[in-house]
Amino acid sequence: MPQLHTPVTLPPSPPRLGYGQQALSFGSCFSEHIGAYLRDGGLQLQVNPLGIQYNPLSIAAGIERLFFGERFTEADLFEYGGLYHTFLHHGRFSAPTAEEALRLMNASYEAVQTALPQLRSLLLTYGTAYVYRLAGDEYGGVVRRVVSNCHKLPERTFVRERVSLETLLATWRPLIERLRERFPELTIIQTVSPVRHLRDGAHGNALSKATLLLLSEILTEQFPATCFYFPSYELVLDELRDYRFYAEDMVHPSHLA
């Protein structure tokens, strides 16, 4: 029988997630689905404590705040459309009052703080190298800061760009050093989401994914005792190279995949 897929070789000794260990997952919508499967399997895993974050700069900013920063206050909030938001959180943390928004945000912050003493693994899912930066300070944010969520603000509020590999490395190298210093036994498992972002066309998506793959590769090479790569992207695009394994939008992996 002819072989109808391209086998993908898994890393020889990928780090294993223990049932008694704490793990945190940050990243795109793909991480939400994988995280649900892992939790259903009995792992102690908190998934996206700030909500979905698609790009590595937002993920890094979220880790910085939750691991090394303070609780959220009214100074972090802005109001738009009858709801209070931050540029670091997903819309599921937004609320009609500042008090309720801060309650939701700080409950998640405290849950992370509780998990940190036993933290052993970080799961990072990079979705895209395209980011939205604040074009001005109209909503209290810092100009040029990358946001995790646009919260349906007017398009003029942001500048969209594909960040360079050099920019990503300049953020992640010092962050990993800081994490290694505080959590000597920490393992960081990186993966690239196979979900395609086609706003910029197939070629634009390929450039974005290539940037993320290079980021993962370089960090794995430079921090071999801490950083690892799991080939989710390759497994879906090669081993599951059949549209039966895609949802109706032909972009997201299906439940069968």
Question: Which residues are covered by each model-predicted region?
Answer:
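Extracellular glycan-modifying ectodomains
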Residues: 1-257
